[in-house]
Amino acid sequence: GSELSNHFPYINSEGIETATFTDNQSEGWIDPFMFHGALKSKATELGAEFVKGNIKSLSEIKAKTIISAAGCWTKELLEDIPVEPQKHTVFRVKCPKHIPEMPLTGDLTTGVYWRPEGKEYLAGSPKSVFDATDLEPAWDDFEELVWPALAKRIPVFEELKLTGGWAGYYDCN
């Protein structure tokens, strides 16, 4: 705990016995929207054609290997593949006392994670829902689960304000 506080003085390390981190500047995260756009652009540049439309019929295809890119919707296409959508809510927050050098952080005691996103932060709810039929964010999770966990671990986050959020699916098997 004390060594963690030496590197990240804004963290309340009370109750933390073990923490891991790297400071070699070679780790990070990917913006999935931008990554998707970059992949699509490169594929188009290399001759791929993207066709959008409705499926009119299905037929059997024999192949040694099939790659499905259906993600969370795999079960609708391939019933036997055990992939289930799991709804997950992410909140966007702003804090008057911005901490510029904050790594992606996960608190395993609460399941809440957070990371910087420009001048704001993204924070994920630990509560996920299988078989959710809507993608409305679980707004109550912010007040009940996320904000208390953030404020406990990063005391200046007591002052943060919710600025947005969304829900999406993780594909789980």
Where do the language-model regions lie?
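Short hydrophobic/aromatic beta-strand or adjacent loop that forms the aromatic wall/cage
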Residues: E17-A19, Q86-V90, T109-G111
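Conserved beta-strand-loop-beta-strand element in the redox core of flavoprotein oxidoreductases
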Residues: K52-I66
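A general structural signal for well-ordered alpha-helical segments in protein cores
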Residues: F35-H36, T74, E143-W147
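Short, solvent-exposed loop/turn elements at beta->coil junctions and helix N-caps
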Residues: S5, I55-K56, G165-Y170
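Active-site lid/adjacent beta-loop-alpha segment flanking the redox-cofactor pocket in flavoenzymes
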Residues: C95-N173
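Central helical "cap/lid" subdomain
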Residues: A63-P103
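A short alpha-helix-loop-beta-strand transition element characteristic
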Residues: G1-S5, I81-E84, E159
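Flavin (FAD/FMN) cofactor-binding and adjacent substrate-gating region
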Residues: G1-L46, V51-K52, C172
